[in-house]
Every structure is written in C-alpha cells, then in structure tokens.
Swiss-Prot record:
Keywords (A to Z) from UniProt: Amino-acid biosynthesis, Cytoplasm, Metal-binding, Methionine biosynthesis, Methyltransferase, Transferase, Zinc
UniProt function note: Catalyzes the transfer of a methyl group from 5-methyltetrahydrofolate to homocysteine resulting in methionine formation.
GO cellular component entries: cytoplasm
Subcellular location: Cytoplasm
Protein name per Swiss-Prot or TrEMBL: 5-methyltetrahydropteroyltriglutamate--homocysteine methyltransferase
Source organism of this protein record: Pseudotsuga menziesii (Douglas-fir)
EC assignment: 2.1.1.14
Length: 22
C-alpha cells in the first residue's frame, strides 16, 4: 500500500491504515 494510505498529512497513522494492518 502507499505511504499516503498509512500516514495522514500530519504524520499520524490513519484509522484506515490501522484497520488494514490489524
């Protein structure tokens, strides 16, 4: 997946990314 999907613009892990990596 793209880093943009894992990190939001503020440099925090996005909720969607956490769901994908869970």
């Amino acid at each position: 997946f793209a880093l943009e999907s894992f990190w939001d613009g503020k440099g925090n892990a996005s909720a969607h990314a956490m769901e994908m990596t869970k």
